[in-house]
């Protein structure tokens, strides 16, 4: 949102006069599509694939230099037109102004005192760019024929944005002209800036984002050049990778879900004015009023005249903020790292553990989270770890007898341990696992802090190093917390303290002190699901059109604990090899 526009905005009136042969670009994009549709690389080979894809993309960018349609002047020059347009079409424009807040970029500043929970901003549907408005635009005929556009609302919005940007008479021109000219998402990172994310959890999503975007561009370049319904689009003579990267990032950093006009389902939308608000910790204070058919936002807190107006974007980790929003949020109370856990099928007690977990509604293998806040684990992760560490006798107690159901219900309740021994085992396991994850990083926490302090880094490089530092700090906190808990329960066991008794009124699988206890099970977020959908759809379409000869491999879900440990060992070994062979990394850091 506002924060994502910190970078310089480059604009000019029309596309440049440079020419490049469509056949030449078509040949390069076909090669790019082939590369991006090949099977996923093996462990330790992702960086090599990323560099190869990037090399092709840069070759295309170089040939297309000067062909994009951009605007004259600075972004802020268009803010008065945006406010006028919004006011004329029923949006609220009183009580705030758009201002550059330096570190956070552009945002909204209160021009009067605004009380907490006061409705201060509303934007009617007619101003929003939505999948529905895209279907009713010049993009409609192509949308009706293309399965990717139909399956992927975010891609539809990106093309809607590009088509309207190329139309000087577009209703949305005042909004589009006010958008940033570029972003700080990893799609804009230089190769050296991406290198700072080596060994982090986030790097895999960064690679995936870059590969997916390149594949989409390559696929749609051919569609625009060859599909009969693309003939009338204003993109045929000028559809550059730079254009697509900008549109994808604009949508990625700004898209939100709103209900359709009849309220029967949700659709994706870009919301002018509102998307200028920067993020802070808090609660969601934006909703959609179906009766008045408008997006409405109430104040998160009291804002005095002259103060920046913030909103809360949601319970996102810093990895999600960096990858999908293009900024790092210091002191993010919802920051977390992923931890893959699973019961090995070679475990002698696998069947019993799987049954107990199934009754608790927890899969035998999943991606959980370790949280920035205390306690570091959710009720669901606690329940999983308890089952993971159970003895045969403890498993029987949770499967048989009149109290079995009650025991299942208390698995996630931190007040009622299965046994002192079970608690010691689970906290020992978590301590060991978090320690193992920490060892996969090339640098230490102290080295990252020193590097940030002593080097003049770009905004994007700073974000990358802060992100890897944040991951390590969460893991280190988890190690320390697990060690404290391990010793506490060991003492309880040594003292033969009585186990707490539970009452029926205390039951509840997810009743614990951890906020967002449902987060770990939905950690495979919309972007991941959408990525698989998009890849499947593109592969089907490409095969149908004879564009791709190779196969496409997809993740088969989570693997066993044993497999995951093996992968982490390989990752650590691979990182060590990269570290020893990469002289530029050693010099820079």
Swiss-Prot record:
Polar residues bias located where? 10-20
Q: Which InterPro entries match?
A: Rubisco_LSMT_subst-bd, Rubisco_LSMT_subst-bd_sf, SET_dom, SET_dom_sf, SETD3, SETD3_SET, SETD3_SETD6_MTase
Q: What is its main location?
A: cytoplasm
Q: Which modifications occur after translation, per UniProt?
A: Phosphorylated by GSK3B, which is required for recognition by the SCF(FBXW7) complex and subsequent degradation. Ubiquitinated by the SCF(FBXW7) complex following phosphorylation by GSK3B, leading to its degradation by the proteasome.
Q: Which PROSITE patterns match?
A: SAM_MT85_SETD3 (PS51565), SET (PS50280)
- Gene for this chain: SETD3
Sorted alphabetically, which PANTHER family does this protein's record hold? ACTIN-HISTIDINE N-METHYLTRANSFERASE, UNCHARACTERIZED PUTATIVE METHYLTRANSFERASE
What biological process terms from GO does the record include? actin modification; peptidyl-histidine methylation; positive regulation of DNA-templated transcription; regulation of uterine smooth muscle contraction
Positions modified as Phosphoserine?
513
GO MF annotations in UniProt: actin binding; histone H3K36 methyltransferase activity; protein-L-histidine N-tele-methyltransferase activity; transcription coactivator activity
Reactions listed under catalytic activity: L-histidyl-[protein] + S-adenosyl-L-methionine = N(tele)-methyl-L-histidyl-[protein] + S-adenosyl-L-homocysteine + H(+)
Residues the record lists as binding S-adenosyl-L-methionine = 75, 104-106, 254, 275-279, 325-327
Which is one Gene Ontology cellular component term of this protein?
Answer: nucleus
Renumbered to this chain, the Basic and acidic residues biased-composition regions fall at 559-589
Recite the UniProt keywords alphabetically: Actin-binding, Cytoplasm, Methyltransferase, Nucleus, Phosphoprotein, S-adenosyl-L-methionine, Transferase, Ubl conjugation
Higher taxonomy: Eukaryota, Metazoa, Chordata, Craniata, Vertebrata
Q: Where in the cell is it found?
A: Cytoplasm; Nucleus
Summary of subunit composition and partner proteins: Interacts with MYOD1.
Source organism, top-level taxon: Eukaryota
What's the stated role of this polypeptide? Answer: Protein-histidine N-methyltransferase that specifically mediates 3-methylhistidine (tele-methylhistidine) methylation of actin at 'His-73'. Histidine methylation of actin is required for smooth muscle contraction of the laboring uterus during delivery. Does not have protein-lysine N-methyltransferase activity and probably only catalyzes histidine methylation of actin.
Question: Where's the SET domain?
Answer: 94-314
Cysteines joined through disulfide linkages: none
Please give one Pfam family short name.
Rubis-subs-bind
Extract the ranges annotated as region (Disordered).
Answer: 1-22, 547-589
Protein name per the record: Actin-histidine N-methyltransferase
